[in-house]
């Protein structure tokens, strides 16, 4: 990942601002700071976009005092080129899920009744035009994902930079349910 970023850095010019979306405990960012500083020196600004209070990236601030490392809660950046990257970030965002049954689209919802969770289907007229999917198909839409991508792409189109998204999920053309719940 670091080699890829350094090669992009050399190709598109000087980008001193790096932002990780959803750094969790900061493992990837720590590795990147080590690698990138060897190639680019310490005139690099690192931004950590983490919405969850459950994860702590405080060790990055202690271990790398010579770098500018900022934790941010909103996707708002200085008017400069940025390089954004994330690992499994978009998987953690909420989705609205729809299922096609008897040639009709339904929104899948979770209902709590008598202290038990159950899946219910609510008819949805929004997808009536989507006919190429067969019964049993699942569509997942994330308004928050669209908002974040729009902000990042607008920033990149105005000020330049790059964006690396990686995910280790399986590739499947089949429209399947990807929601998981861990208790």
List the predicted regions and their residue ranges:
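Conserved adenosyl
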Residues: 3-96
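Class I S-adenosyl-L-methionine
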Residues: 75-183
């Amino acid at each position: 990942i670091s080699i890829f970023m350094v090669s992009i850095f050399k190709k598109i010019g000087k980008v001193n601002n790096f932002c990780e979306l959803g750094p969790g405990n900061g493992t990837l960012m720590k590795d990147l700071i080590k690698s990138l500083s060897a190639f680019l020196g310490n005139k690099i600004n690192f931004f950590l976009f983490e919405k969850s209070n459950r994860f702590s990236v405080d060790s990055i601030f202690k271990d790398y005092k010579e770098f500018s490392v900022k934790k941010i809660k909103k996707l708002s950046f200085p008017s400069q080129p940025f390089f954004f990257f994330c690992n499994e970030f978009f998987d953690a965002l909420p989705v609205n899920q729809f299922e096609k049954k008897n040639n009709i689209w339904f929104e899948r919802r979770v209902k709590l009744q008598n202290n038990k969770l159950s899946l219910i289907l609510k008819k949805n007229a929004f997808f009536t035009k989507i006919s190429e999917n067969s019964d049993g198909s699942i569509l997942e839409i994330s308004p928050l994902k669209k908002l974040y991508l729009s902000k990042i792409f607008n920033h990149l189109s105005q000020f330049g930079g790059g964006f690396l998204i990686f995910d280790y999920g399986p590739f499947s053309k089949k429209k399947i349910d990807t929601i998981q719940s861990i208790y």
